[in-house]
């Protein structure tokens, strides 16, 4: 199977270059636009003007965003598992009740 490589031209923080990746070009553009938005936010709010420092701060903010999302999903997964466990417990209680009633009725 031939893998199609996506391409992206980056022109940001005084650097200009092109990259290729094993992702669709449109996906790469979405990532790049998000990164540019974070870079602009850093420039506006921090007062930092050094491109390397801006890039590092933007990277840390994105890592924070990713970490919080992973943690949120983990908490959601744990909540889902608890709910599934409670639902399973209720179903087992209902089944036990029906089975017990069936045995009682069958003996009469």
From Swiss-Prot:
It comes from the Bacteria. InterPro entries: Cell_div_ZapA-like, Cell_div_ZapA-like_sf. Pfam families: ZapA (PF05164). This is Uncharacterized protein TP_0846. It comes from Treponema pallidum (strain Nichols). The lineage of its organism: Bacteria, Pseudomonadati, Spirochaetota, Spirochaetia, Spirochaetales.
